Amino acid sequence: MLAWVGDHFQIPTVGIAVDPAHNPIDSPAVQALVRANRRALKTMADQPDLAIGYIASFLNRMTHEEVQRYYERYIRPYYTSDGRVDLNVARQAVDAVAAELGVASVAADAIYASSL
């Protein structure tokens, strides 16, 4: 049976992962990357036709209609123009991954910092 992971398991992947030991959060490079990421998310949310065209460029075996359905199902509901993550979805995902790995879970808001 073929299945898409997003049909069964939701992990918010919006954002940028930074190890503050190597790249301080307030560094100009990290801040520039955050701004670029937010611009990209805003474009995906505000210009769905552009996003669908881009997705189609690397999922080139899919028809335009299939790519549009993909966007509507896996992109539009989860990628917001402001880059914020739904912490309820994130909590469920973090707990599920921790359970699968047999490790203690951590607070989702510790992973998905909204202060940047």
Task: Describe each model-derived feature in a short phrase.
Residues 5-6, 20, 85-88:
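Short, structured secondary-structure boundary patches
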